[in-house]
UniProtKB/Swiss-Prot annotation:
It catalyses: N(6)-acetyl-L-lysyl-[protein] + NAD(+) + H2O = 2''-O-acetyl-ADP-D-ribose + nicotinamide + L-lysyl-[protein]; N(6)-[(S)-lactoyl]-L-lysyl-[protein] + NAD(+) + H2O = 2''-O-(S)-lactoyl-ADP-D-ribose + nicotinamide + L-lysyl-[protein]. Upon metabolic stress, forms a complex composed of FOXO3, SIRT3 and mitochondrial RNA polymerase POLRMT; the complex is recruited to mtDNA in a SIRT3-dependent manner. Also forms a complex composed of FOXO3, SIRT3, TFAM and POLRMT. Interacts with NDUFA9, ACSS1, IDH2 and GDH. Interacts with PCCA. Its cofactor is Zn(2+). Pfam families: SIR2. This is NAD-dependent protein deacetylase sirtuin-3, mitochondrial. It is found in: Mitochondrion matrix. Changing residue 21 to G/Q: Reduces targeting to mitochondrion. Residues 118-380 form the Deacetylase sirtuin-type domain. Changing residue 7 to G/Q: Suppresses targeting to mitochondrion. GO terms for biological process: aerobic respiration; cellular response to stress; negative regulation of ERK1 and ERK2 cascade; negative regulation of reactive oxygen species metabolic process; peptidyl-lysine deacetylation; positive regulation of catalase activity; positive regulation of ceramide biosynthetic process; positive regulation of insulin secretion. The lineage of its organism: Eukaryota, Metazoa, Chordata, Craniata, Vertebrata.
Length: 399
């Protein structure tokens, strides 16, 4: 009986760790350290976790031996998707013929999963607007990329001739992506901080798309906003940090690359703006903004997708090429009965090569697509007032 008593006590202690939430601030919590893997893995993983803390299978628990912390789960790392085989040319010629914004429903495909969509019928942009107006969609998850920031004056990383990469030709980069790779950063951090100076919060202002997302939040419809952007314009527009998952990092915080001491992003702003590489005042190591480089783990908040996407009743995808994983594959994480609305220049990612019958694509200029949706929603006046009010705050009385 004593043996089983100690085992029950150990299990209760471990369960106490599991129930903590990912959103708990300040470092890696117990849920982040063990909860996702143990809860999602099932009974075998729980018992394996107990065995991992106390030896091989069948070894009695030692009451005098404290529980050891289970290993931290592997957080997804950023990497670029390999190009998939091109779709038939006649298909793409029908949607790339001009720059005019067009709307169409993507044809149904064979989808396996709960809530199959093949019998739901196709949707249009107006149908999506009516679902929102009728509050049939109240848990909206949004995925955004660099395309929503280009109207603010920030060039797209991958646009030939206008991307930020092309502005760094003065540096002897072995290839453009090297600026976001740790080995090159440790060898020469100057190119990255030149880029950081241009992107640092305060240099650019939100545009209509950012304020549309803010309006979704104000109306209580935004479950979560997943952004690939590091410009911080979602925060500037007034969307609270609790609603954001900045999948590729943020300038709002920074970390010493040597002693791992954390710093507020504003602490290194003066150095960045003065073209100086920021240094840790304790160990003199380089202080790097918490931007995710290729091969680095994504922020712990990215794990919220495990809960958010199954709960979503509408997925909006705005201004992204869906080329970087694991962000791109999140589009497949919603239920197959959930509408997916893409507002983008081109048909991309799973919506191109694995479409569903309830997919809607509004192709063309992103801002024009958002304005069309706002008009169908009847939010034009509210949007205009919000933009004027927030722009006035950013400009200030003396500007």
């Amino acid at each position: 009986m004593a043996f089983w008593g100690w085992r029950a006590a150990a299990a209760l202690r471990l369960w106490g760790r599991v129930v903590e939430r990912v959103e708990a601030g300040g470092g890696v919590g117990p849920f982040q350290a063990c909860g996702c893997r143990l809860v999602l893995g099932g009974r075998d993983d729980v018992s394996a976790g107990l065995r991992g803390s106390h030896g091989a299978r069948g070894e009695p628990l030692d009451p005098a031996r404290p529980l050891q912390r289970p290993p931290r789960p592997e957080v997804p790392r950023a990497f670029r998707r390999q190009p998939r085989a091109a779709a038939p040319s006649f298909f793409f010629s029908s949607i790339k013929g001009g720059r005019r914004s067009i709307s169409f429903s993507v044809g149904a495909s064979s989808v396996v999963g709960s809530g199959g969509s093949s019998d739901k019928g196709k949707l249009s942009l107006q149908d999506v607007a009516e679902l929102i107006r009728a509050r049939a969609c109240q848990r909206v998850v949004v995925m955004v990329g660099a395309g929503i920031s280009t109207p603010s004056g920030i060039p797209d990383f991958r646009s030939p001739g206008s991307g930020l990469y092309s502005n760094l030709q003065q540096y002897d980069l072995p290839y453009p992506e090297a600026i976001f790779e740790l080995p090159f950063f440790f060898h020469n951090p100057k190119p990255f901080f030149t880029l950081a100076k241009e992107l640092y919060p305060g240099n650019y202002k939100p545009n209509v798309t950012h304020y549309f997302l803010r309006l979704l939040h104000d109306k209580g419809l935004l479950l979560r906003l997943y952004t690939q952007n590091i410009d911080g314009l979602e925060r500037v527009s007034g969307i609270p940090a609790s609603k954001l998952v900045e999948a590729h990092g943020t300038f709002a915080s920074a970390t010493c690359t040597v002693c791992q001491r954390p710093f507020p992003g504003e602490d290194i702003r003066a150095d960045v703006m003065a073209d100086r590489v920021p240094r840790c005042p304790v160990c003199t190591g380089v202080v790097k903004p918490d931007i995710v480089f290729f091969g680095e783990p994504l922020p712990q908040r990215f794990l919220l997708h495990v809960v958010d996407f199954p709960m979503a009743d509408l997925l909006l995808i705005l201004g992204t090429s869906l080329e970087v994983e694991p962000f791109a594959s999140l589009t497949e994480a919603v239920r197959s009965s959930v509408p997916r609305l893409l507002i983008n220049r081109d048909l991309v990612g799973p919506l191109a090569w694995h479409p569903r019958s309830r997919d809607v694509a509004q192709l063309g200029d992103v801002v024009h697509g958002v304005e069309s949706l706002v008009e169908l929603l009847g939010w034009t006046e509210e949007m205009r007032d919000l933009v004027q009010r927030e722009t006035g705050k950013l400009d200030g009385p003396d500007k």
